[in-house]
Amino acid sequence: MTTHTEPRDTSAVGKTKHPRNFIGTAMRVLTTVTGSEFAEKYQIREPINRIAYQATKTGFQTLGAANRAFKAAQGGSGKAKRLTSTPKDYFNLTPDDEQQMIAETVREFATEILRPAAYDADAAATAPEEILKRSAELGITMINVPEELEGAATERGVVTNALVAEAMAYGDMGLAIPLLAPSGVATTLTNFGSDDQQRTYLPDFAGENVPQSAVVIAEPKPLFDAFNLSTKATRVPSGYRLNGVKSFVPAAGSSELFIVGAQLEGKPALFIVESDSKGLIVEADPGMGVRAAGMGRLLLQDVAVPTSALIGEGESSAAAYRDVVRLSRLGWSALAAGTAKAVLDYVIPYVNEREAF
């Protein structure tokens, strides 16, 4: 199947013409981010400048590195880096000035880059590779990685991440899903990963070539229960063996890393699985309405992972799984809200301006 490198002249919503070409728009968005207080606060101006320079040379070609060799960074303290939340005296979900700026920047990116590409991406049932790499340039993944691991995060940003998801889905949910999936992996490793797991994987999520990845929970069965998984993990002398089928995996064919949910001794747990693991098979499984996400299934047939692949241990493993499920539900809700807002903004002027006869 051929994937168009240039989006069509019409968008998937309203069939409106492109305001700009892809490279020009992307460069303008990067320039906006580079000059913002957001870039200054999170110290991402320099890496974004490097990306912008590279973009002018390559025309935003993909610099992917499939199945890269993940290696632990040196100098670990043995203690994992954790982000904390700033306590507030009252419950208030109103975005502050910084969150508002981030949301507006992402929404502009989504409207001017994602939406024009959505029609072709949906037809091809895959997201264009050049678009899959753009989230790194906005710092979306970087703000979920602690500063000590080359990221930009100083505290947990649940509300900020929800605003980003809502703004991204305003452009197109199908493309937003694979773009945001690596942030879910980075957040999981930051919140629950061990020191060794964090040093092995998180630095890549703060770099210029973020690995495509996903947290994989869903399974292809009716009345799916996230806390009663059919995928099983069995202890073996060398670690664990995973068997089962996972579904609804975004950008499954191009992902380099998965965090897989599996039942371990009666309780759900999370395991880190690299894409080149023996026994791991990826099948295409397009999802209606989100075909652009490149959804697929993971077939795990005696996939061997080391002891260090388990996220958490004992009760902390189960607690990590519960929190990841809660956060994923919040993320899906934010995506739905962004999509609904886009529909509303299209329908209102259409109803007011249409001529029935």
Per-segment meaning from a language model:
Residues T2-Y90, T94, E98, I102-E104:
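Extended, charge-enriched "interface" segments that sit outside catalytic cores
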Residues P95, V282-F357:
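Glycine-rich beta->alpha junctions and the first turn(s) of the following alpha-helix
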Residues A127-P128:
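His/Cys-centered metal/cofactor-coordination and adjacent catalytic loops
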Residues E208-A218:
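A short, Trp-centered hydrophobic/proline-enriched beta-strand micro-motif
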Residues P222-D225, Y240:
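Hydrophobic, small-residue-rich alpha-helical packing segments that form membrane-like cores
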Residues T231-T234:
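A structural signal for short hydrophobic beta-strand segments in well-ordered beta-sheet cores
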Residues N243-E283:
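A short core secondary-structure module
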